[in-house]
Structure formats: structure tokens, C-alpha cells
Amino acid sequence: KHANPCGFGIGINLKESYDRAVSTDPVSYFGGIVGFNREVDADTALELIQPFLECIIAPSFSETALEILKKKKNLRVISVGKEGLQDHYSIKSIAGGYLYQQKDNQQGELEKLETVTHTKLKQSEFQALQLGWKLVRNVKSNAIVFANSDQLLGVGAGQMSRIDSVKIAVRKVSEAGLNL
């Protein structure tokens, strides 16, 4: 919402991924945009017609999914194809023109990280760290993200103080009934 993610999930199927994303912040996703990285199937489409959503974006939609989604009034369904999900450039308006530049999509070499504390990260903690790093780069201003290995748990963003962003993220986790 407002250029910040309010949910994200990974699952064994699209519906499970969607359910995890929604459970991150069941209030804020109302009226939002939902994006997928693979074809939307009929089971997922049935879930998508329940809430009020502005837009659904995916590489493709099954014929049955499209028939289901067409029944929802004022819903924009955008099929971008697999290449459409590649995000290589950003455009920003500035005084007197626009700034068109290559986006910073570098992931870093996480496998080369060195733990400098006495406690080594467990595999699940390292996976949570990787997901958190991927997500936080999409959150604006004093971004705080809590994640586990397959779900965004809470977001704090847009505050003058990082401490306030942390408080918001912790509150969001608590309100969603999730655990840090």
C-alpha cells in the first residue's frame, strides 16, 4: 500500500503463498494491489474475489481464473508475461524532468557473509535474513522488516524515527497474531 509491501508469502502453491501474505496484515491489504510471480489458478482466483482489491498482477491467468475474476466489478487484472516482472530501471520525476536509471537489484553475496558473534545462524535464521533483505529494499524511508523463511511478518515504514518504525512493525506482528 502506498508503494510499500504490506504482505508477502512463499508456499507450496499459490493459494498458500497468498494466504501467508494476507495474514501479515489482513487490514492493510484491503483495497490494495496483489502481485504474483506465476500463473494465477482457479483456486487462488476464488480467494481473490472475496476482498476488495484494486488490481491483480501476474505473468498469466488460467482461463478459469479469468472467468472467475471477470465477475468482480472494478477489479483490474493485468497479465504482464514473465519478462514483464523484470524490474531493471526506475523512473523518478524531478524538478524540470525525469531521472531514468538502472535499478539497484543486486542481491549481494550472502553466502560470503561472516558471522562475527559467538552464536552462528541456524539455516532457518539465514533464510529469514535473506528474505528480509529482499523485502526491505522495497520499503520506503526508515524501513524495518521482520520476516521468517517464508513470510513477511511485519513492516514499519515512512517514519521520521527508526525507533517508531520498529514499534509499528512490532505492533503489526502482534496484531496479526504472528510470532517473531
Say what each PLM segment does.
Residues 1-180:
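ATP-dependent carboxylate/acyl-activation modules
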